[in-house]
A protein has these predicted regions:
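Structural signature of alpha-solenoid helical repeat junctions
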Residues: 79, 116, 153, 181-185, ...
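Terminal, low-structured helical/coil segments at or just beyond the last alpha-helical repeat
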Residues: 313-348
Length: 348
């Protein structure tokens, strides 16, 4: 693993560790930590009226004043949730997806706060991504975007990043998505049709239009989908990869996963196994919302490490995959490969 990757991981972890601890049991109010440029962090208590990709609106406990804070100033949010919502989050964290889905759907039906409604939908998208159910994930994600076009939940956007040809049902749905007026719907449809022989040209044309969209999240994701197109056709150059890596480091955290996957594929095609592994490892280590994609990235990273002779690290990754992603296609492949490598390098 390169120093740059290690430094990036440390910065990412440090951001979380710096968050001030709140104890929600002390108050039924919502609690928010705000950090304005050049000032100390400021705790605010009250009722969150809305929380979008642009701003957080809060009615303070003291004075009942309405205050609005840019999303960029919001460090941490702790709110009270229903019992079903809390249980759903716990089940999701434990990987008990069927239980999580049941609890979260119950929470969805009883929740009347719009911004929390979006939070629950985002968790439901994660449940669907866990099992690779992109159709259900797409349905729930589009509900989020319909409520907030600039949502910060684009980290769960069920876009296609690999070069798999979609099945007939997915092609049908993706064409419907791409025909809608919503930029997010178009983006999702175009991403899944990029590998469909009959729709690839239309998909790429749509992505080029979206790459100039006024919504920066849509714009950046569409641009990374175009990187994917260049990579699949073998048109990407070393200069492209250098620019892409620099662009990724400037992106908001929630948008990086797919870009790192594409970068890893591009380095793999250009026979740069170490750099490919470094890019791919960002997914299982940090950006693992799409569990199926993270599993694939981890498997391919281990393959790349094996190519450069780092057998010990490759074996560790394959071994970890058996326990972490054992229920996925890539986890099963990892178990077979792990045993083969161990046997090949066993001491007589």
């Amino acid at each position: 693993m390169t120093n740059r990757l290690r430094d990036g991981l440390l910065r990412f972890l440090a951001t979380g560790l710096l968050c001030v601890f709140f104890n929600p049991a002390l108050s039924a109010d919502d609690q928010v930590m705000i950090e304005q440029q050049g000032r100390s962090r400021l705790p605010i208590t009250g009722e969150i009226e809305n929380f979008t990709g642009r701003e957080l609106t809060m009615r303070t406990r003291v004075g009942k004043k309405i205050r609005i804070f840019p999303k960029s100033e919001v460090v941490e949010v702790i709110a009270s949730y229903t019992q079903h919502h809390d249980l759903g989050r716990q089940m999701l964290a434990r990987g008990r997806i069927l239980n999580a889905t049941v609890e979260l759907n119950l929470a969805l039906n009883e929740e009347d706060r719009t911004w929390v409604h979006r939070e629950i939908l985002a968790s439901l998208v994660k449940c669907s991504l866990w099992t690779g159910d992109y159709l259900t994930a797409a349905s729930d994600f589009l509900k989020i975007v319909a409520s907030d076009e600039e949502t910060f939940h684009y980290n769960v956007a069920p876009l296609a990043w690999a070069d798999d040809v979609p099945d007939i049902k997915l092609v049908h749905e993706a064409k419907l998505w791409m025909s809608q007026s919503s930029p997010a719907s178009k983006l999702m449809g175009a991403s899944h049709l990029l590998c469909s022989p009959d729709s690839a040209d239309e998909s790429e044309s749509t992505l080029r239009q979206l790459s100039r969209n006024s919504n920066l999240r849509i714009q950046r994701l569409a641009q990374m989908q175009l990187w994917r197109s260049r990579t699949m056709t073998g048109a990407s150059t070393s200069g492209d990869l250098t620019r892409w890596e620099a662009s990724l480091e400037e992106l908001p955290q929630e948008l990086r996963a797919g870009g790192y996957f594409v970068l890893g594929q591009a380095h793999r095609k250009q026979m740069n196994p170490e750099r490919s592994a470094n890019a791919l490892l960002w997914l299982p280590l940090v950006y693992d919302t799409d569990r199926q994609l993270a599993a694939r990235a981890c498997f391919q990273a281990a393959e790349q490490l094996e190519l450069i002779g780092d057998h010990a690290q490759a074996i560790n990754l394959f071994s970890d995959m058996v326990f972490r992603y054992g229920d996925t296609r890539w986890g099963s492949l990892a178990e077979v490969t792990w045993k083969e490598i161990r046997a090949a390098h066993a001491t007589p």
